[in-house]
């Protein structure tokens, strides 16, 4: 949110006439006298962008802004390469948000006004919106023109345009460098200082999301359909049940916290296993159905239900002995619910307590499915006789969640991430990893698939493990597929070396950005 300026841009008093933008000579004086001769009620005035002064033209306004506020509209337009619509959005953004000049001058790409909502005029008959922004790209004075049509400063203008283009490119490169530098600083700080999970910047990404920002996520879990799908996933639900029922010593007479309890199935398993008290927390509307379910099963004396985010609610106890949660998303980390579990661990888990599941791994495997690749990518080359190949740029960067036929696998799997929920921190959930895929077939590599495995191990008399991989029983998580823009041939026995980087989307920290490098090619994917 930008800081607010002192003025609101809606003043009514016309100040002294400022200097003109350009030196128009003696003619300017005659024009001013003519303007003064016009009836006062016929004049059209426009307010300054940063104070309540009124002016008769856009040029006067811009001159005032430059002299009095150190805001150069010419420089702003050239700095960001603004054309007609970009200029309109800029003016309306300033009118609507009232930012300070310091804030405006500090902006680098991407700009905050690049939204369609700023095409709507804030002021009726705003003279600044009637200004032709192309004038700012023209020479200030008209040069002498020779009979052949060439002007005396043609080369200078061309040089100026070239310099402006280079300046814009340098601005963009500088912005990227600053962003990279900030990431490096944060990484170094986390690595050296081992920042506590309650204070590191990644922690607050999810914890600090406001209700209007996170509403879609929680509302999606308010409908019974998604819970029905999860409950019917036997691999998932029976693994939790078997872990709890086959290891009752972990729950007997213990205080248990269920983070994101949904319908309360894990809480009821824990209660049946002998838990002294189960505290079940969920922000979604499904909690009201969970209350009825708990009463129907006569477990209300053991299970306490609390509606809200674990980062915001107050629990009836200071510490718990066990934390259970089914937090896994597509590619394990999608939706960033593990952040909330780690927050709960940091704040509520007693010394010597346990979090389940406790061990998780993410793996990659190479895929050869030429027909599937053609169906999604080559399809756009000829759509009813029309070339729509430009659509590939939108299709390829989206990771696909679907079941991979195990017959299409052409390599051994490779683990790229190992998570121990007892020791990991939120900053660890954004990572880079080198990997090697050893091919088992001679084929065309068309994609890389990702999946995860879950382990219930700590203090377990009966260890429970399940996999979401393509060679295991299908789960509702399926697999996450990263289609390659350019498939390439491989021979059995090859070692495909690559690198993967996973981090949260800054605009939506519950979604993921995945960058994959393989066969000397790099592609960035979104999972949202």
From Swiss-Prot:
SUPFAM superfamilies named in the record: beta-beta-alpha zinc fingers (SSF57667), S-adenosyl-L-methionine-dependent methyltransferases (SSF53335)
Residue ranges of the region described as Mediates interaction with ALDH1A1: 184-528
Major enzyme class: transferase
Keywords: Acetylation, Cytoplasm, Metal-binding, Methyltransferase, Nucleus, Phosphoprotein, S-adenosyl-L-methionine, Transferase, Zinc, Zinc-finger
Gene: Prmt3
Source organism of this protein record: Rattus norvegicus (Rat)
Main location as per UniProt: cytoplasm
Phosphoserine found at: 22, 24, 169
CDD domains referenced in this protein's UniProt entry, alphabetically: AdoMet_MTases
UniProt name for this protein: Protein arginine N-methyltransferase 3
Assigned protein family: Belongs to the class I-like SAM-binding methyltransferase superfamily. Protein arginine N-methyltransferase family.
GO aspect biological process, one term: methylation
Cleavable signal peptide: none
Organism classification: Eukaryota, Metazoa, Chordata, Craniata, Vertebrata
Recorded domain comment: The C2H2-type zinc-finger is responsible for substrate specificity.
Zinc finger C2H2-type: from-to: 46-69
Location of the protein in the cell: Cytoplasm, Cytosol; Nucleus
Quaternary structure annotation from Swiss-Prot or TrEMBL: Monomer and homodimer. Interacts with EPB41L3 (via FERM domain); the interaction is direct and inhibits the protein-arginine N-methyltransferase activity of PRMT3. Interacts with the 40S ribosomal protein RPS2. Interacts with ALDH1A1; the interaction is direct, inhibits ALDH1A1 aldehyde dehydrogenase activity and is independent of the methyltransferase activity of PRMT3.
Ranges where the record places region Disordered: 1-42
Record's catalysed reaction(s): L-arginyl-[protein] + S-adenosyl-L-methionine = N(omega)-methyl-L-arginyl-[protein] + S-adenosyl-L-homocysteine + H(+); L-arginyl-[protein] + 2 S-adenosyl-L-methionine = N(omega),N(omega)-dimethyl-L-arginyl-[protein] + 2 S-adenosyl-L-homocysteine + 2 H(+)
Assigned GO CC terms: cytoplasm; cytosol; nucleus
Residue ranges annotated for the SAM-dependent MTase PRMT-type domain, each copy included: 214-528
């Amino acid at each position: 949110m930008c800081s607010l300026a002192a003025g609101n841009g809606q003043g009514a008093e016309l100040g002294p006439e400022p200097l003109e933008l350009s030196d128009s000579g003696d003619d300017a004086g005659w024009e001013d006298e003519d303007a003064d001769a016009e009836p006062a009620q016929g004049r059209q005035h426009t307010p300054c962008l940063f104070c309540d002064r009124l002016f008769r033209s856009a040029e006067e306004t811009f001159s005032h802004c430059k002299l009095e506020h150190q805001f150069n509209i010419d420089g702003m337009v050239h700095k960001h390469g603004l054309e007609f619509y970009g200029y309109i959005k800029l003016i309306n953004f300033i009118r609507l948000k009232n930012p300070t000049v310091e804030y405006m001058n500090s902006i680098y790409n991407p700009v905050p006004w690049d939204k369609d909502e700023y095409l709507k005029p804030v002021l009726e008959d705003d003279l600044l919106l009637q200004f032709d922004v192309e004038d700012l790209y023209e020479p200030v004075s008209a040069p002498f023109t020779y009979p052949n049509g060439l002007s005396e400063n043609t080369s200078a203008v061309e040089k100026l345009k070239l310099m402006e283009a280079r300046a814009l490119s340098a601005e963009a490169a500088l912005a990227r460098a600053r962003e990279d530098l900030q990431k490096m600083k944060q990484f170094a700080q986390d690595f050296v200082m081992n920042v506590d999970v309650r204070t590191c910047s990644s922690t607050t990404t999810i914890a600090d999301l406001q209700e209007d920002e996170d509403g879609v996520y929680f509302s999606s879990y308010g409908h019974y359909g998604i819970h029905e799908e999860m409950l019917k996933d036997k691999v998932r639900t029976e693994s939790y049940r078997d872990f709890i029922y086959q290891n009752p010593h972990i729950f007997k007479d213990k205080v248990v916290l269920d983070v994101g309890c949904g319908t309360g199935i894990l809480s009821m398993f824990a209660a049946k296993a002998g838990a002294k008290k189960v505290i079940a927390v969920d922000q979604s509307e499904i909690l009201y159905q969970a209350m009825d379910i708990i009463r129907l099963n006569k477990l209300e004396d053991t299970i306490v239900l609390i509606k809200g985010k674990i980062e915001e609610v107050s629990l009836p106890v200071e510490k718990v002995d066990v934390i259970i949660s089914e937090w896994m998303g597509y590619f394990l980390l999608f939706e960033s619910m593990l952040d909330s579990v780690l927050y709960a661990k940091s704040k509520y888990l007693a010394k010597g307590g346990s979090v389940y599941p406790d061990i998780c791994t993410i793996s990659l495997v190479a895929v050869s499915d030429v027909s599937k690749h053609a169906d999604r990518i080559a399809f756009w080359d000829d759509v009813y006789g029309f070339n729509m190949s430009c659509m590939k740029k939108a299709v390829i960067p989206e990771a696909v969640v679907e079941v991979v036929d195990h017959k299409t696998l052409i390599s051994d799997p490779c683990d790229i991430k190992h998570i121990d929920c007892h020791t990991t921190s939120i900053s660890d959930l954004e990572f880079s990893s080198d990997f090697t895929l050893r091919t088992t077939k001679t084929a065309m590599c068309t994609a890389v698939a990702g999946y995860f495995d879950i382990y219930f191990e700590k203090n377990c008399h009966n260890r429970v493990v399940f996999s979401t991989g393509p060679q295991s029983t299908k789960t509702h998580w399926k697999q996450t597929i990263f289609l390659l823009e350019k498939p390439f041939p491989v021979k059995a026995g090859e070692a495909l070396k690559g690198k993967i980087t996973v981090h949260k989307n800054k605009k939506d920290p519950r979604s993921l950005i995945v960058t994959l490098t393989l066969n000397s090619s790099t592609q960035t994917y979104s999972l949202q």
